[in-house]
Amino acid sequence: MRGMGNMNNMMKQMQKMQKDMAKAQEELKELSVEGTAGGGMVKVVVSGHKEVLDVIIAEDVVDPDDVDMLQDLVLAAINDAMKQADQLVNDKMGRFTQGMNLPGF
C-alpha cells in the first residue's frame, strides 16, 4: 500500500499545479504589453491572452498619399506586440511546462 501514498501525493501536486496554472492564466488576462513601430509613431497594446486592446497612431504618420507606409507600421507594431506577448506568456507559464517538451509552450 506504500504506492498509494505516492499516488495521493502526485494527485495533490497535479491539483495544485492546475490551480496555479489557472491563476497564472487569469493574471495574464490582466497584463498587457505595448509594441511600437516608426519610433513610437504607431503603438499597439496587446493583452497576455494576445488580444489587441488598443491601436494608437500619431497624427504625423497619417498621410492619405502614403497609406502603404501606415499599413506597414501598424503591421510592424502588431508583430512587435505579439512577440512581447509571447515572451510574457513564456515567462508566466514556462515554469509549468519546464522539461515536458510540449509543442507550443
UniProtKB/Swiss-Prot annotation:
InterPro entries (UniProt xref): YbaB-like_sf, YbaB/EbfC
Keyword tags: Cytoplasm, DNA-binding
GO molecular function: DNA binding
Pfam families reported in the protein's UniProt record: YbaB_DNA_bd
Keyword Nucleus: no
Residue spans of biased composition, Basic and acidic residues class: 17-26
Compartments reported by the entry: Cytoplasm, Nucleoid
UniProt key word Cytoplasm: yes
Gene Ontology CC annotation, any one: cytosol
Top-level taxon of origin: Bacteria
Composition-biased stretches (Low complexity): 1-16
Cysteines joined through disulfide linkages: none
Chain residue ranges for the region called Disordered: 1-26
Family per record: Belongs to the YbaB/EbfC family.
UniProt xrefs under HAMAP family: DNA_YbaB_EbfC
Subunit record text: Homodimer.
UniProt-listed PANTHER family: NUCLEOID-ASSOCIATED PROTEIN YBAB (PTHR33449:SF1)
Function of the protein: Binds to DNA and alters its conformation. May be involved in regulation of gene expression, nucleoid organization and DNA protection.
Protein name listed in UniProt: Nucleoid-associated protein EAT1b_1710
Organism of this sequence: Exiguobacterium sp. (strain ATCC BAA-1283 / AT1b)
